């Protein structure tokens, strides 16, 4: 239709309405009426709800920080006979201190405290090719920041030799400040406690799973997902037995046919000899039979006497142990005593003491006061990674008045040939 002029205005034909273009891809188109209805229904939280529709979910992940590393001067080690207890390292630390000429001789090392244990590597660049040393956490029985020598940190390690032999050695290192030695001792104690608790938790979970498999069946209980194993990783507190030096080495079994035949012949001869002996005893019993009632009475009397003797043997150690435990209070458990405790009470007390002793075997004994060190600001700053003066808390600078002797570059490899080699 052609346009025409009227009263100086141009009137044009209306163009056909354009069709709305379809959304491309996965774009979401929201209508204005839907938004307006949502705003009218929820006037307060409309904007926040609309924004939450397009907001991505955020998660916070805690990245494991690196294990703290300290620059120390390794003084050496000495044998000891006490695995734990107050003052168990005094004599050994004294020997090490005198042997190192009051801390003037030693090897500069990098000491790292981790969930596996204490790892030491050489700090000098020329000695980096030498193998390091790893002291496994479950074999460390005692650690202390020495009170007589405040800058000395010592620990007792249970070395395992061949044929399941055990040797206790006390190791000592010298640091630059007393609070640094205290921080190292507290860190080792806390790491050991946490690792032991995690080891017990995983052990209880595995035991419960094995019990369920025995009751219900091995195929009905699902295995632990591989994702969970990779996420948590293996427990580092106690490595598998295969890594132990005292573990038996398994080899191939060679079958000997001649030896098997000889063993079978010997076994047959022993069985024949045993049958002949039994036949002879039966013949002798048949010849000398007496009154069966008298024999039965004698057997009953012998059984009663044997039971009395066994009961006395069992009661004697229980009574003696409880008398020693209650000796200070003046309570006697003998036959002439007027005061007596039931046997069940004694047995329960001994069982509780035994369970407590077993539970304490894996705990690391600490030679310092935990509460005092945890409230010390200098120690907590060192553990948190803050600097306390001219030297960094994690990567120490030099050692005050403790020069490294050039005549002893070997370090703990010469004196501690029993250490576990550090791999990696």
UniProtKB/Swiss-Prot annotation:
* Ranges annotated as biased composition (Low complexity): 382-394
Xref: CDD domains: PTB_FAM43A (cd01214)
By its UniProt entry, which InterPro entries does this protein fall under? Adapter_Engulfment-Domain, FAM43A/B_PTB, PH-like_dom_sf, PTB/PI_dom
UniProt feature, compositional bias: Polar residues: 405-418
User: SMART domains given for it?
Assistant: PTB (SM00462)
- Regions of compositional bias (Acidic residues) in chain numbering: 261-297
Region annotated Disordered sits at: 261-299, 382-424
Q: What highest taxon heads this organism's lineage?
A: Eukaryota
Q: Which family does it belong to?
A: Belongs to the FAM43 family.
Q: What is this protein called?
A: Protein FAM43A
Q: Which species?
A: Mus musculus (Mouse)
